[in-house]
């Protein structure tokens, strides 16, 4: 039985939203072998008990989900955006990626990009699979004395999904429809993309859209991101224009800082960010976990104070951004135009929570 299924402490990296190490991982985990339980003939690179799949849909228990169930703290996305960590699914509709980021914890050798022959499930099937996988992953917490019964019952009714676990979600051909299918279930969506499919992102309206910007210039991009498509940089630039057009979707640019690789020219980053006119900018530290340890030395992992200093340097060139918030436990800083950063519908007393099947009116 897996550590998640029996309600124990999660082994391996607790990864959330596209590679962030959750608390269980970044505060001491030295293992990084992550894959999926092959429940339905899924990709070969996913084979650990904490990472389950049905066909091309995969889910993993985020370390912060486990922590929240045990009352041991919540993710920075709760602090800044209002996400209830114990009610958040971490999943992906496609375990394939068209980039080979040097800081990625995943195994590039087993991370296929070719999409030929994939039998794509329809969006409703992906939503159903995601919920089933989440319930399976968390089922054992119901017998854990550290987990209050009411908290466990809430976790069995997920209200958020982070479409970010692995691969590049925009390679799934029905991503806009998938987002709407989650919304139809009253589940908020937090989509993380590398920005290489602007034509897809233009059609997507998640609750919050994150795009990774891990280099301020083409040379650094080629060195750090390792894109498998020659026009990836140009596509990322096009995605910035797509984000600028978004009016109903909250937009976030996110940068993973790697010492000696991309921690330079904060003014260039600011100029790049401003092309998108994002609502927020997340700047976080590379975490020395998983397969990235074979590509980078531990010294490439910046300290939290270095992350905050770099974020403040960037903010000097972005006068509209007046707030630099931080969560030391996650080694992340947030640039914002306001202190009111929560998703409006996730604020306490909203209609969203009034409709909740567990805690609603």
Residue positions per predicted region:
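Short Fe-S-cluster ligation motifs
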Residues: 125-155
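Short Gly/Ser/Thr- and Asp/Glu-enriched loop/turn motifs at secondary-structure junctions
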Residues: 86, 156-158, 327-331
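Flexible, acidic/Gly-rich N-terminal and inter-domain linker regions that tether
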Residues: 1-95, 99-103, 107-136
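Pocket-edge structural micro-motifs
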Residues: 63, 93, 165, 336-337
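Radical SAM enzyme [4Fe-4S]-AdoMet core and its adjacent flexible, acidic
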Residues: 3-6, 12-35, 44-45, 54, ...
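Short, acidic Gly/Pro/Ser/Thr-rich loop/turn segments
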Residues: 96-100, 218, 288, 342
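Conserved AdoMet/S-adenosylmethionine-binding subsite of the radical SAM
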Residues: 144-298, 302-313
């Amino acid at each position: 039985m897996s550590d998640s299924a029996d309600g124990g402490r999660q082994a391996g990296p607790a990864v959330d939203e596209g590679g962030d190490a959750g608390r269980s991982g970044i505060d001491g985990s030295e293992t990084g072998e992550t894959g999926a339980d092959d429940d339905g003939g899924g990709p070969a690179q996913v084979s650990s008990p904490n990472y389950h799949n049905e066909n091309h849909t995969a889910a993993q228990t985020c370390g912060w989900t486990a922590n929240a169930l045990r009352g041991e703290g919540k993710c920075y996305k709760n602090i800044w955006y209002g996400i209830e960590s114990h009610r958040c699914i971490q999943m992906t509709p496609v375990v394939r990626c068209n980039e080979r980021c040097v800081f990625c914890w995943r195994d590039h050798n087993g991370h296929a990009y070719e999409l030929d022959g994939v039998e794509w499930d329809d969006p409703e099937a992906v939503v159903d699979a995601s919920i089933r996988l989440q319930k399976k992953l968390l089922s054992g917490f119901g017998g854990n004395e550290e987990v209050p019964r009411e908290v466990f019952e809430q976790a069995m009714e997920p209200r958020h999904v982070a479409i970010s676990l692995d691969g590049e979600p925009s390679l799934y051909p029905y991503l806009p429809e998938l987002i709407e299918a989650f919304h139809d279930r009253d589940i908020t969506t937090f989509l993380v993309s590398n920005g290489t499919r602007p034509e897809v992102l233009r059609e997507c309206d998640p609750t919050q859209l994150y795009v990774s910007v891990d280099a301020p210039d083409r040379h650094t991009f080629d060195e750090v991101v390792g894109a498998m498509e020659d026009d990836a940089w140009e596509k990322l630039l096009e995605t910035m224009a797509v984000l600028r057009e978004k009016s109903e979707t909250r937009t976030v640019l996110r940068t993973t800082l790697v010492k000696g690789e991309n921690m330079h020219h904060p003014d260039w980053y600011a100029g790049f960010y401003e092309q998108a006119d994002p609502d927020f900018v997340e700047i976080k530290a590379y975490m020395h976990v998983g397969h990235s340890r074979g590509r980078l030395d531990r010294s490439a992992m910046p300290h939290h104070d270095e992350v905050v200093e770099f974020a403040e340097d960037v903010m000097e060139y972005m006068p509209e951004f007046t707030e630099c918030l931080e969560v030391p436990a996650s080694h992340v800083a947030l640039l914002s135009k306001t202190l009111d950063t929560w998703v409006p519908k996730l604020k306490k007393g909203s209609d969203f929570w009034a409709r909740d099947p567990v805690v609603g009116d």
